[in-house]
Amino acid sequence: GPAFQDSIEIGTPGKGGAIKVYGDFGLPEEFEKRIRDAVRLRKMTVDLMEGS
């Protein structure tokens, strides 16, 4: 994929895990989708680890 230079870090390593989302601040709609997808996958991972 493309080499994104912008990133946002969400969460903390001790509270469900930190994720870093890369994207392009010049394309906010695309970046928002990447963030939403990453948060959804992070929640799924936490749920799996907790046995939910």
Regions inferred by a protein language model and the residue ranges of each:
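Compositionally biased, non-globular sequence tracts
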Residues: G1-S52
